[in-house]
Regions:
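Glycine-rich phosphate- or other oxyanion-binding loops that anchor nucleotides, phosphorylated ligands
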Residues: 1-91, 103-110, 114, 119-145
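Short glycine/threonine-rich loop/turn motifs
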Residues: 96
Length: 145
């Protein structure tokens, strides 16, 4: 077996991130260019106590699917990119609002799907064949034991 230990310091491809931000802005999509994601085991919503803890740690997005997938993609010498469709304010962030429901999340997610499709199709048209900023394609070479 081949054992690799790629760095996770910069999890996502800087070149694809730059393209996603540029394309999203061109399409008029609200883009948050950076942020820190905390990944929880799901599928579930976080508790108020967890949400307060995550907020106090400075994490901006709670996600159930951003990891380990991105790390595994890097192990395959591919360029990982995360595009999160924000669906709700977390339970611990906004005063005494009622907790979010699955129904509400699905409604917001479905309303975002058209933007996601437009973004992805436009990005695919513009992904450069030769990448000169990222080193994603060198992960195996640089991290095999």
């Amino acid at each position: 077996p081949i054992v690799t230990h790629p760095s996770a310091a910069e999890t996502y491809c800087p070149e694809l991130r730059k393209l996603a931000v540029k394309t999203g802005k061109e399409l008029g999509i609200t883009i948050h260019e950076q942020g820190t994601v905390v990944v929880i085991n799901g599928p579930r919503f976080s508790t108020k106590a967890e949400s307060k803890f995550f907020t106090n740690q400075g994490w901006e997005v709670i996600n159930m699917t951003a990891f380990p997938e991105a790390y595994l993609v890097k192990e395959m010498d591919m360029c990982p990119l995360n595009i999160s469709l924000i669906t709700d304010y977390d339970a611990g962030l906004v005063g005494d609002v009622p907790p979010v429901s699955h129904h509400e999340v699905i409604q917001v997610f479905n309303s975002n799907v058209a933007n996601l499709k437009n973004l992805l199709f436009k990005m695919i048209e513009n992904i450069p064949a030769d990448r000169n900023i990222c080193t994603c394609g060198d992960t195996k070479k640089c991290s095999q034991l």
